[in-house]
Curated annotation (Swiss-Prot):
Top-rank taxon: Bacteria
Name used for this protein in its record: Small ribosomal subunit protein uS3
Family: Belongs to the universal ribosomal protein uS3 family.
Native source organism of the sequence: Anaeromyxobacter sp. (strain Fw109-5)
Gene3D superfamilies referenced in this protein's UniProt entry, alphabetically: 3.30.300.20, Ribosomal protein S3, C-terminal domain
Domain KH type-2 stretches: 38-106
GO BP term, example: translation
NCBIfam families named in the record: rpsC_bact
Family annotation (SUPFAM superfamilies): Prokaryotic type KH domain (KH-domain type II), Ribosomal protein S3 C-terminal domain
Amino acid sequence: MGQKVHPIGFRLGVIRSWDSKWYEEKNYAKWLHEDIHLREYVKEKLGQAGISRIEIERAANKVKINVHTARPGIVIGKRGAGIETIKKELQGKTDNEVYLNVVEVRKAETDAQLVAENIATQLERRIAFRRAMKKSVQTALKFGAKGIRVACSGRLGGSEMARYEWYREGRVPLHTLRADIDYGFAEAKTTYGKIGCKVWIMRGEVLPQSASARPPRSAGGARP
């Protein structure tokens, strides 16, 4: 049975960059666990803000956290009170100085993580899974996505036997490295159990830096 590699991990170093940007030898395990705890806390605290991704950068004794969100107003709060509260609580979870930066996601409809969370929320509200999936597909294509694939697995519709359902529209070439494919996963906690929601969104093609930096060949095909 064929398995699919993670689309983002597959493109790291080609057209995608890492969400944790730092290098360490001795304290690697400590910093890795610290990153996990910081991400879990931000996701739990700002669950209603539509968090797409959380980037963590480290330099010297400083930690910079970039929160990509569809609703920056919820994160910042009234006169910046919300972001200051979160910053103080994050400061208590690390020995380093914390800098918190909020980045707005312009098109939430073509962000795979936000689309997956939206489908999961609809399933928790007892909306029919086919309706939720088809609506997300149509909305993504309407806002400029080149292709989208949506998959849900679990006790769909409360059936006794779990199953796997998926829809696809447009192009979603998983093995083309230059294809800018965003991937998101979310879980819907229903009375029948958990339902997994996966979303792949093709947003276009990106030429890798290494390829774009090469000098063009002459008309005859000979190297300069």
